[in-house]
Amino acid sequence: YTYRAEGVRELEYPIPNPEPINKVLYGAREDDRLDILHVDNGNPSIIAENIEPSIEITKCLVENLSDGAVLSFGLESADPHVHEMNWLNCDPGQLKIAIKHINDFGRVKGERGLPKLLPGLNFIAGLNGETKKSYDMNLSLLDDLRSEGLWLRRINIRQVEGQGFQKISKNDFRNFKKKVREEIDKPLL
């Protein structure tokens, strides 16, 4: 959504430019040597803050990607304190808008019977300002997504370690990961 977007260097939320993205994807799809076409990450805040131009891009993704594609969204943490301390660029409200947007277009089944395009969600443990309540906020967000009937293709939970990051409670991290896998992944995925 940010490839050749307007204001990439100047704006907090650059305005997506569908034309160059469409050109790349339609061109790639026309290549007979290509069997599978997927993308990697998308910025949910860009989608949420620019719904109109994002619609055309999302339709192009759904039309050209192989079914089972994932558009990973890096929320990292649902905790506003962690968001602020680490200069994260997406908040839970923006994330929900972007997930709903991708669900609106991407849940259609492809040739292999899989949804064409679903969002993935990335969490990072060990960011500055994180507490046990941060994990609770992450779980609450996931519960909301499940309650709203929104689909995710996968949930990635990683931990960051090293200089500049805080130590994490291994017990809190394990409990969070276990709850996500048992209470969210199984019914949602």
What are these regions (language model features)?
Residues Y1-G120, A125-N128:
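Conserved SAM/AdoMet-binding glycine-rich loop
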Residues E30-L34, G106-L114, D136-L139, D143-L189:
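Auxiliary Fe-S-binding modules of radical SAM enzymes
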Residues E84-N86, S134, I168:
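A generic "cationic amphipathic patch" detector
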Residues E52-T58, L127-R146:
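Catalytic cores of alpha/beta
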